[in-house]
Amino acid sequence: MKNPNRKADVRRAADGIANRADTLVVVASHGGSAIQYAKWISDILETDMVPANRKYLGYTSLYKNIIYVGCVKEGRIDTLGLLQQNYANFNLDGKHIITVAVGLGDPTDAYLSKLMEYNALTSFGESFYFLPGRSSVEKRKAGEMVKLDRCMKDLPKLYGKEDAEVIGLRLAKGYDGVDREKIQPIIDEIQAVRSNRYQPEISESEGSASDGSDDL
């Protein structure tokens, strides 16, 4: 007896393969919350995922939609500059690029504006999102403390007084703002793109994120 659901199963499988082939999640993380967010996004959207390094960044040329997830290090989204520098080489023109920053600050207008400025996001990509991250005091190695002290001294140079104080406190005391629900706007955007329903908004930024290592 033929299975009446067989054709539907085959069609759904084919759709899944097509979706995986149209979107790539690129993640710059060393095992922290940025990679956790990237995995959630990739699983829900059924996409491929690669690390943000010279060996794999070129794969972005093969996909229609790129979701770049990176932890914030002293105002910079980790390794994003390498992708931006190779914009032409990777044929990124015309692709739907979403940049996701994972850091420790609150998503104030001032803080997000600084991140956009430091990472040249006003002229790169379609959308920018900010997700809340994590700072694990227990996981720090002795050698990291010197670097941490220097970073905390530099915070007032990077951000406004209130934003610098929030980040400094979370670095010193530890913080875990990771929230799976925060990725929903990113999921919604890619699903809208896939169904030709996407309409760009004037401003898109949400959340806040960080790596298992400390994000700034």
Residue ranges of predicted features:
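FMN-binding flavodoxin-like domain, especially the glycine-rich phosphate-binding loop
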Residues: 3-20, 44, 48, 74-216
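Structural motif
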Residues: 22, 64-67, 96
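The conserved SAM/SAH-binding core of class I Rossmann-like methyltransferase domains
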Residues: 26, 50-52, 100
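Short, well-ordered alpha-helical microsegments
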Residues: 34, 56-59, 76-77, 108
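A short, well-structured beta->alpha microelement
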Residues: 45-59
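Short, solvent-exposed polar/charged micro-motifs at secondary-structure junctions
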Residues: 59-62, 138-140
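Glycine-rich, N-terminal phosphate-binding loop of Rossmann-like dinucleotide-binding domains
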Residues: 69-72
